[in-house]
Amino acid sequence: MKVWMAILISILCWQSSSWAVCPAWSPARAQEEISRLQQQIKQWDDDYWKEGKSEVEDGVYDQLSARLTQWQRCFGEETHRDAMMPPLNGAVIHPVAHTGVRKMADKIALSLWMRERSDLWVQPKVDGVAVTLVYRDGKLNKAISRGNGLKGEDWTQKVRLISAVPQTVSGPLANSTLQGEIFLKREGHIQQQMGGINARAKVADLMMRQDDSDTLNSLGVFVWAWPDGPQLMTDRLKELATAGFTLTQTYTRAVKNADEVARVRNAWWKTKLPFVTDGVVVRAAKEPESRHWLPGQAEWLVAWKYQPVAQVAEVKAIQFAVGKSGKISVVASLAPVMLDDKKVQRVNIGSVRRWQEWNIAPGDQILVSLAGQGIPRIDDVVWRGAERTKPTPPENRFNSLTCYFASDVCQEQFISRLVWLGSKQVLGLDGIGEAGWRSLHQTHRFEHIFSWLLLTPEQLQNTPGIAKSKSAQLWHQFNLARQQPFTRWVMAMGIPLTRAALNASDERSWSQLLLSTEQFWQQLPGTGSGRVRQVIEWKENAQIKKLGSWLAAQQITGFEP
């Protein structure tokens, strides 16, 4: 077993180091950054435990707390976990300590942990607040908040008002101590779609209120531990269900390996449940005697949390891109995070104005999720660094008629035009994207957006970053492009018309297009006066005329005199 534990620790350490790189800060800056985040988390803790309020989403709090711990370890500071524990206004001792649960990084780590154990069961990791329920002589004698695991606050009066908690029990439960989760009741909660809804904070708020309102009936309880209870899990579940704790039996499943856990975890992630969850807990039926339970020392259970719907990511750099139309967009380069099995390292912020409204700088922590079609998006800026240096955006000198010809200032828009003309809906140049175009342009110094038509097989073969086998295919693609219809080439030149309007125009030659009048363009579908002015300006542009003449010299269909 020691060998397997060593392997497990090695894997966890490797994963931690691969995703959590230490910041390159001076000692002074590290102290400032850590102190600021520590103060903020302490403020959130005070709001949460003293007033039952939460100014931050549960998931954001958890991730920023983990980030603080990471920074503290990076710079040799103590983690001070006690700072994140609730203040003990009361000091009621738990009959049995709350151990907490160690989290597994992934399925591999879980598999290694399970390999050395038997009689294993999986339960949902219900998202609420932990509680101890003490029954004496068949009656609810005391309810204690988790607190620091050893002591908590007296919640007895509050819990007695929660109708979902049995006030009387019998049989083996008559004199028992139970541990569980007070949760917010939900009807058909689908975790994948609805997320955490800040359930933990909402429960804490209800439990902290001074008034004993009917809203406590919106709470339920999920018992996940019966210290010193029956040895067989099936017996435990049966007795709990008979007493009224039916959810425990319904949502506790026997499992033999990590594959089975993964299937249950995925099912609970996607199906309707009566509570919010943030993962699953795998536990061995065999537990030590309760007198040996201590916070942080439970070896008989582990958690495998869901990947958060939104992840906190550090902004590593701010980059500017110029699109084919000349619009400047801003992109944030991120320390990699995983979202729904997708590694995210970049997120589009939008326009320069939007970036300025977000006020994002390198070193900030932003909340990122996936929008439709798996596209990363920014949900919020959750933490701003102490030192914030924002880059200066490029001058807004570009428009839809600039950068058909290469120049130093036109680098980004020029590349964007190449990417556009190579796309499936234009010339359909398979096998080349932005990186390939950059390599070709840097090596062969294109004059304009169609210069690639002159490249020889030898030139393509000698282009850095393009394999010999791929260079032959690319040359073939470039030659096939010569056979594309006239309208595709006009689209590649950036005519400000939709494909439908262009096809309806029935233009089949460059000379005919140049002679078309304003009245002709106005007859096309979806072409208003503003669009017509853009077309006239486009076809009269000197760069466009020069490109048309060049394509005629290359005998491209529709451009020949």
Curated annotation (Swiss-Prot):
Function: Catalyzes the formation of phosphodiester linkages between 5'-phosphoryl and 3'-hydroxyl groups in double-stranded DNA using NAD as a coenzyme and as the energy source for the reaction.
UniProt cross-references to Pfam families, sorted A to Z: DNA_ligase_aden, DNA_ligase_OB
Regions that span the bilayer: none
Species classification: Bacteria, Pseudomonadati, Pseudomonadota, Gammaproteobacteria, Enterobacterales
Keywords: DNA damage, DNA repair, DNA replication, Ligase, NAD
NCBIfam families tied to this protein: PRK08097.1 (NF005987)
Protein name according to UniProt: DNA ligase B
SMART domains assigned to the protein according to its UniProt record, in alphabetical order: LIGANc
Family from the record: Belongs to the NAD-dependent DNA ligase family. LigB subfamily.
Biological source species: Escherichia coli O127:H6 (strain E2348/69 / EPEC)
UniProt GO BP: DNA repair; DNA replication
InterPro entries to which the protein is assigned, alphabetical: DNA_ligase_AS, DNA_ligase_B, DNA_ligase_CS, DNAligase_adenylation, DNAligase_N, NA-bd_OB-fold, NAD_dep_DNA_ligaseB, NAD_DNA_ligase_OB
Keyword Ligase: yes
Active site feature: K125
